[in-house]
Amino acid sequence: ELLAKQQPQIRLLSAAGEQALQECGLGYRTRYVLHAAQQAAEGTLDLKKLASLPDEALFARLMELDGVGKKVANCVCLFGYGRVGRVPVDVWIERLIRDEFAGQDPFPQFGLEAGIVQQYLFFYKRSVG
């Protein structure tokens, strides 16, 4: 019910507790999401202030959060903050680089649009295997 109709407000997430978040299907991510929501609700993690950071500083700050690695930080940069130059690398992108680009990372050539290109290539690789 917490996520049934819309994205919940930070204060609702932070007060929900682990059980409610587990029921949303977050699995092992539950405590990380809860902790980040609590930090945001308390003001120690200012999500709006993050938006004003340059790409690399935003990425670095996200990497400081518990449970956040390179892929998740890049996903948040790309999808949450519209930083279209960020390229999340998961198993599908690793396979794509290996199979279609002989192990050479193709994304630097796309510059500030690399994240958009990544999405097209991600869906391509997922559909053809």
Question: Which residues does each predicted region cover?
Answer:
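HhH-family (HhH-GPD) DNA N-glycosylase catalytic core used in base-excision repair
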Residues: 1-129
